[in-house]
Amino acid sequence: MSLTVVPAYEHPQEIGALFSEYTQALIAGEPSFSGYLSLQNYDEEVQHLEEKYGMPWGRLYLARWNGAPAGCVGLRRMDEWNCEMKRLYVRPQYRDKRIGGKLVQQVIDDAKTIGYSHMLLDTFSFLDSAVRMYRALGFYEIERYNNNPIDGCIYMKLDL
């Protein structure tokens, strides 16, 4: 049983499938999330991954478990000092393997190497295991930092 984490730019179909599963899971938990996707230009994001997550300021990773696509995470630049973790998702059948934590640690390490001072994220309160993981990694709650209109959203920050 092995985990590999690789840059995802050469795997658009696998990332597209993971992003689709991710958004469907969020819409199932919070139906109003579908409206927020349009504010984020989500369809365009999926078609042009490198524009949002490309190097040198961003990252996009694909996690594989025994070669099968298991999860993903993105990192995007907000400004010179701040970045945002996006689209962390692990398929349900792989959630007991600590893949999410490895993906998050990968983008934290990258953010430090790039030179960011802070990493931000938004998540939903119903994603309780993710919120617990973020807190365990040092993230803390902050005020809203983006245009997310959804009630029940949690905004978090990590000092790098």
Model-derived segments and spans:
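Conserved G/P- and acidic residue-centered "switch" motifs that form tight phosphate/ATP-binding loops
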Residues: 67, 98, 115
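Acetyl-CoA-dependent GNAT
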Residues: 3-86, 91-92, 104-106, 110, ...
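Conserved catalytic-core motifs of GNAT/GCN5-like acyltransferases
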Residues: 120-131, 135-155
